[in-house]
């Protein structure tokens, strides 16, 4: 029973209570009862603790990065590395005159990575980028320009360049070809081969081919494509077509786990390599690196000599201003860990991936990744089908399992494989530095649980959960998406591999 109101006292309603402007608790201020600014910059300022708390609360709805096993991107660095990067946040990397030691650290990183990839001593050249996508754009530009110059010197037309690559390439390769007007020639995967076929790749080459792309760690299954076999066939044919190695994921794995594997500048026809520092280079995003065998493969007319803020500098980038933090973070990891540290970490990740592979195989999944150091530390798998002797068709697929795992907090993607694989569906778990054996055990239990739930649940229930999670991951729907109009217009595009074949653009 509610207490009676004393005589002379006024009953106060919620609407009558005005939030105190000087209230020390964020949630006692009027900001807690208002929507966050969405379209227009607010007229008035707000206290820093309020802005911080409101944004932090919104970000808590994001997935936990440690449970995001879709991405190769690093989610752990030591506090000392984080402190160095925080202290350098205000430095603009491009200001060489003002920050000469930062430039020196960049050069050290580029040299270390070039030497790791066995670039010829003192003539290999390299540069940082904001990630492998920019590095790939730069490498493609260099290959195209060099091919064009050779054609012009021979008095031949140079208006129809093409590039040969596997249909399992990451979408940035499609972008590079499209943006720079280069014809894409694909070597399609099959249901039993998920990498490029060296012989077919070389046969696709003609006088207009600017280069062949070989992937050291494919996006889907983590497989290492046979760079040396491609090179040997080119040499045998006396073809001068160069090879670029996309080592975005594998460039910091293979040298430490399988050091005898020849994929880098030890291979005759390899002229350039890209690698992501923010993947198995163990740095927070975003930093990448691109290295050329020598200046011969980087045409001079792509290089800009700039006098910027009083300093002469050589530039070959798509970006200009960028933070110095990631380069400093990369240098910390290289000298802190050394080759021994990287070797221990990469071998541990490989062991964890192999253990996870064995456990998933016991649960009846078909394993698509090679493992045992012969590929990236990831596990690619799918449900068994008719090819494996299954007689009954399941009411659910890999996408349904991915949605059920999302309800447990795990972000594990499902994909439709590359063209010519019969719309094969698969899932991929990336084993990163902070994915311990104990966390691996918890994941295995949840995969087993979700698989059992899928067996019991109806098709309608599975579909409702998919729709629910799809709406949750696409945001509240209240805010106008600046790219919304473009999405509506280009939703059914048919110029990409995804639009043409249904292949999923995999998370990198």
For each of these PLM feature ranges, what is it?
Residues 106-113, 169-174, 197-205, 319-326, ...:
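Structured alpha-helical segments in the cores of large, soluble enzyme domains
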Residues 37, 70-73, 93-97, 122-130, ...:
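A short glycine/serine-rich beta->alpha loop
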Residues 244, 256-377, 381-390, 394:
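Active-site C-terminal subdomain of aminotransferase-like
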Residues 1-111, 115-120, 141, 147, ...:
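Non-catalytic terminal extensions of PLP-dependent enzymes
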Residues 13, 17-24, 130-304, 309-312, ...:
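Conserved PLP-enzyme active-site core in the AAT-like
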Residues 209, 213-214, 235, 253, ...:
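Hydrophobic alpha-helix feature that most strongly marks membrane-spanning transmembrane helices
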Residues 101, 128-135, 165, 169, ...:
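Secondary-structure capping and boundary motifs in well-ordered enzyme cores
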Residues 90-97, 120-127, 158-160, 184-189, ...:
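Glycine- and acidic
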């Amino acid at each position: 029973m509610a207490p009676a109101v004393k005589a002379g006292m006024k009953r106060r309603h919620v609407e009558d209570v005005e939030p105190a402007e000087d209230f020390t608790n964020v949630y006692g201020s009027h900001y807690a009862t208002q929507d966050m600014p969405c379209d227009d910059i607010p007229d008035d300022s707000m206290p820093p603790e309020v802005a911080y708390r409101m944004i932090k609360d919104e970000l808590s709805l994001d997935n936990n990065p440690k449970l995001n096993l879709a991405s190769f991107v690093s989610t752990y660095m030591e506090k000392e590395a984080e402190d160095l990067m925080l202290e350098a946040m205000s430095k603009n990397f491009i200001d060489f005159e003002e920050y000469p030691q930062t430039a020196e650290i960049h050069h050290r990183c580029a040299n270390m990575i070039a030497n790791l990839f066995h670039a010829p001593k003192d003539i290999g050249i390299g540069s940082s980028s904001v990630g492998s996508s920019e590095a790939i754009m730069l490498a493609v530009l260099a290959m195209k320009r060099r091919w064009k110059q050779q054609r012009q010197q021979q008095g031949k037309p140079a208006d129809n360049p093409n590039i040969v690559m596997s249909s399992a390439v990451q979408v940035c390769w499609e972008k590079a070809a499209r943006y720079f007007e280069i014809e894409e020639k694909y070597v399609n995967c099959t249901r039993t081969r998920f990498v490029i076929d060296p012989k077919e790749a070389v046969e696709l080459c003609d006088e207009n081919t600017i280069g062949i792309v070989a992937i050291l760690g494919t996006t889907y299954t983590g497989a290492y494509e046979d760079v040396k076999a491609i090179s040997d066939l080119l040499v045998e044919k006396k073809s001068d077509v160069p090879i670029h190695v996309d080592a975005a994921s594998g460039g910091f794995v293979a040298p430490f786990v399988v050091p005898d594997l020849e994929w880098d500048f030890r291979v005759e026809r390899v002229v350039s390599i890209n690698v992501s520092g923010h993947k198995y280079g163990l740095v927070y995003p975003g930093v990448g690196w691109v290295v050329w065998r020598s200046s011969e493969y980087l045409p001079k007319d792509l290089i800009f000599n700039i006098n910027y803020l009083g300093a002469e500098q050589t530039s070959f980038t798509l970006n200009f201003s960028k933070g110095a933090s990631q380069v400093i973070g990369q240098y910390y990891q290289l000298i802190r860990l050394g080759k021994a540290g990287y070797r221990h970490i990469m071998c541990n990740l490989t062991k964890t991936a192999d253990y996870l592979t064995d456990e998933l195989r016991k649960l009846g999944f078909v394993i698509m990744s090679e493992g045992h150091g012969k590929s990236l530390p990831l596990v690619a798998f799918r449900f068994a089908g008719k090819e494996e002797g299954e007689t009954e068709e399941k009411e659910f697929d890999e996408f349904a399992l991915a949605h059920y795992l999302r309800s447990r907090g795990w972000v594990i993607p499902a994909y439709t494989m590359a063209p010519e694989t019969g719309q094969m569906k698969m899932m991929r778990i990336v084993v990163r530095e902070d994915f311990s054996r104990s966390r691996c055990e918890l994941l295995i239990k949840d995969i087993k649980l979700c698989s059992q739930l899928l067996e019991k649940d109806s098709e309608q229930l599975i579909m409702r959960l998919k729709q629910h999670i799809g709406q949750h991951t696409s945001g509240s729907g209240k805010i106008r998406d600046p790219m919304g109009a473009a999405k509506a217009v280009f939703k059914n595009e048919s110029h990409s591999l995804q639009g043409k074949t249904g292949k999923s653009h995999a998370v990198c």
